[in-house]
Amino acid sequence: MGRAARRAAERAGAGEYVYDCVRRDPRWDPRCESRGLYYARLMVDLELPAGPVAEHLFDPSDHTDQGDWRVELALDVLSRLVRLSRREAAPILRRYAEEGAHWFDALDTLVELGDPSLTIGLDELAAARCDDRALGMLIPAGYNPVIETWAARQPRIAEALARRREAGRARRPAGAAADRGERTEAELLDLARRQGDGAIGAIFELGRRRTLALLDLAEELLPARPSRFGGAVCRALREYGPETLPRARVWAAQRGGCEDMGLRILARYGTRQDIPFLMDELRGAVGRSEWHDAASPIEGLGRLRAGEAVPLLKTAWTESTYAYLRPRILTALTRTAPHTAESYTVEGLWDCEEGVRLEAVRSAPLTEDTRIRLQRLHLDTAEEPGIRAAAATRGL
C-alpha cells in the first residue's frame, strides 16, 4: 500500500485509480481495515477534487442498494478530507445526511468530526428522524461539542444525552462480584456450564483466578457453534501465560475446534520448539491465500525471531490483500531480519494501516526522504496521536 501511494504521486492518471478504489471499496475485511485516511491523503497529494466522490454517493443506486458498504468508505474519505483542511468535503457530507439513503451514517460522521459549525440546523433532522435508540447510538461516550450544541436546542437530544451520562455512571452491584469471589471453583464451573444468568461472570472469575479448569471448559464450549460464552472463555484465556502451552499444543495439532485459540497461545507464549509447527501453519495459509489463518503464525514467528520465516513473510506482504496482517508482517520482519526490513519500513511510512505506520516510524532508516515524511506525519493533525508523537521523537 505504501509503495502504491508513492508511485501514484509520479504517475499521470493515478487519480482515477483512487476514485475507483473509493467507489468499489477493495478492503478484504472492512471491519478491521482502515483506508479512509490513506485515500484522503492521496487525494490531497494529487490535488483531486471531491466531486467524483459526491457523484458516487448520489448515484441513483444509492436508494436501491440496501447495504451501507457502498457508501461507508466514501463517507470516511470525506471525513478525513475535512480533517486534512479540505473543507469542501463538509457540504457533501451535510447534503448526504439530508438526502442520502444512509443518512444516519453521514450524520454520525459529522458528529465524530466534532465541529458545530459544520452541523448547524442538523439537530432538527436528528430529532425528527431518530428514535430513542438511534439517538443513543449517535451520542459518543465522551464530551462532544456537536451533541452539546444540539442538546441545548433539542429536548429529545438533551434527554438522550442525560441517559447516556446516567448509564456511564451506573455500576454493576458489588454484591454480584463479591458473591462470585466467594464461590468455589466447582461452583463457578457449574454456573458457567449452565450458560444462564451469571455464566459470563463466572467465566471471568475463573479467568481472574487463572485456574486450569477453564481449559476444560474451553474444550466443551469452543467446538460448538459460536456463542457469547465461548467468546468470554477466549477473552478470559488471554490473561493466562505459558502454563497453557501444553494444552495449546494439543489444541493446535488436533483440529478439534480449539485450534484457533491454541494457535493464539502459541503465538504469544510458544518457544523455539514450536517454530516448525508455526512454519507449517504459515506455509499452508500462504499457499491457500487464507490470510485470516496467517495472523497467529506470523505473530509467533516474529516474536521468536525465526529467520527461516523471512521468505514467507515477504510473500505475505506482497500478495496479501488483508491489511490487518500488514502490521504483524512488518513487526515480524523487523525482528527477524532488520536489514531486509529497511525497505519495507520505508514503504510503511505511507501505508494505510495505523499499526504499519507506527512500526515504520519507529524503525525506518533516517534519510532525507524519510525525515521529510516523519515531519509530515508529526505535523498532520489527521494522523493518530501515537504516530505523531513517535514521528516527533524520531525527527529530533
Sequence positions of predicted segments:
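Extended amphipathic alpha-helical repeat scaffolds
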Residues: 1-199, 211, 383-387, 392-396
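Amphipathic alpha-helical scaffolding segments comprising HEAT/armadillo-like alpha-solenoid repeats
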Residues: 13-25, 48-63, 83-96, 116-127, ...
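C-terminal structured domains
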Residues: 292, 296, 315, 322-335, ...
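Short inter-helical turns and helix N-cap capping residues of alpha-solenoid HEAT/ARM repeat scaffolds
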Residues: 67, 99, 130, 194-196, ...
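Residue-level detector of extended alpha-helical repeat arrays and alpha-solenoid scaffolds
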Residues: 36, 71-74, 103, 196-200, ...
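Core register positions within helices of long alpha-helical scaffolds
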Residues: 7-8, 42, 77-80, 109-112, ...
